[in-house]
Amino acid sequence: MGHRIKTQNRGRGGPTYRAPSHQYKAELKHLGNDKVTVRGVIIDIEHDPARHTPIALVRLEGEGKKVYLLVTEGLGVGDQVAWGPEAEVKNGNTLPISKIPTGSYICNIEARPGDGGKFVRASGVQAIIIDKTVDRVGVKMPSGKMKWFSSRCLATVGVVAGGGRGEKPFVKAGKKFHKVKSQATYWPRVRGVAMNVIDHPFGGGGHQHTGRPKTVSRGTSPGRKVGSVAARRTGRRKR
C-alpha cells in the first residue's frame, strides 16, 4: 500500500501544518477612521503568540470597552493613546497619514482607508514620511523602497516595539521549537536522503545520495513530485 510523503500531508493541511490561530489574541486593527476620534488609556502590556511584538490592552474612554493595540517603543501602562483626525501627533497615536509631519517615523500603515493596518507591523521596524501631494503621501518603507498611500490612510506614530529581537541567538533547539510551534511551520526539516525509503523517494539505500535523477516532470504524480520539478537546467552553469 502506498504511503503519503510529507509534501502530500502539507497540501492536505492537517493540524501539524496549520497555524494555531485559535491561540492568537487579536488582529490589531485601527479604531476610528479619518472622521471619528477614539481615545483610551493603556492598562496592561501583554504577549501575543501570533507575533514577536508586545501588544497593549487599552480601555476606551466613556464606554469602557477593552481593545488591543500594537505597541510602539516608549509606550507603557498608564499612557494615553488616540485614533482619528483630532489625535495629537505623538508616539503611539494613530491619525490620517496626511496629518503627520514629513520626516516622522510611522508604523502599522493602512493599505486602503479603513482596512485596519497592513504594512510595517513587525518588531523594531519603522517607515519614514518623505513626500506629500494633494491626495497622496510618499513613504520610505523598511525595505528602502518608496511607496505611495492615500492621504486618508491611518498610520501610527513611532517605531514598533521589540527591536533587536533577531540579534539574540536561539542557542538551544528547544528554544527554536517553541518559537516555531506558534507558526504554520513544519520543523525540523529533515533531508529526503536521510529518510527511510517509505517516507521519501530519495530515502533508503544506506547512502546519502538520491540514487536516481532529481528532475521530475510537471505532470508527475504527487507522491513522486520531489526534487527539481520541471527544471530547465541542473548543475553548475557553464561559463
Swiss-Prot record:
Ribosomal protein as UniProt keyword: yes
GO CC annotation: cytosolic large ribosomal subunit
Alphabetical UniProt keywords: Ribonucleoprotein, Ribosomal protein, RNA-binding, rRNA-binding
Residue ranges of the region described as Disordered: 1-20, 202-239
InterPro entries for the chain: NA-bd_OB-fold, Rib_uL2_dom2, Ribosomal_uL2, Ribosomal_uL2_arc_euk, Ribosomal_uL2_C, Ribosomal_uL2_dom3, Ribosomal_uL2_RNA-bd_dom, Translation_prot_SH3-like_sf
GO molecular function: rRNA binding; structural constituent of ribosome
GO biological process, one term: cytoplasmic translation
Region forming the signal peptide: none
Top-rank lineage group of the source organism: Archaea
Pfam families noted in UniProt: Ribosomal_L2 (PF00181), Ribosomal_L2_C (PF03947)
SMART domains assigned to the protein according to its UniProt record, in alphabetical order: Ribosomal_L2, Ribosomal_L2_C
NCBIfam families to which the protein is assigned, alphabetical: PRK09612.1
Listed HAMAP family: Ribosomal_uL2_A (MF_01320_A)
Annotated PANTHER family: LARGE RIBOSOMAL SUBUNIT PROTEIN UL2, RIBOSOMAL PROTEIN L2
Protein task: One of the primary rRNA binding proteins. Required for association of the 30S and 50S subunits to form the 70S ribosome, for tRNA binding and peptide bond formation. It has been suggested to have peptidyltransferase activity; this is somewhat controversial. Makes several contacts with the 16S rRNA in the 70S ribosome.
Family: Belongs to the universal ribosomal protein uL2 family.
Subunit comment: Part of the 50S ribosomal subunit. Forms a bridge to the 30S subunit in the 70S ribosome.
UniProt-recorded name of the protein: Large ribosomal subunit protein uL2
Source species: Methanosphaerula palustris (strain ATCC BAA-1556 / DSM 19958 / E1-9c)
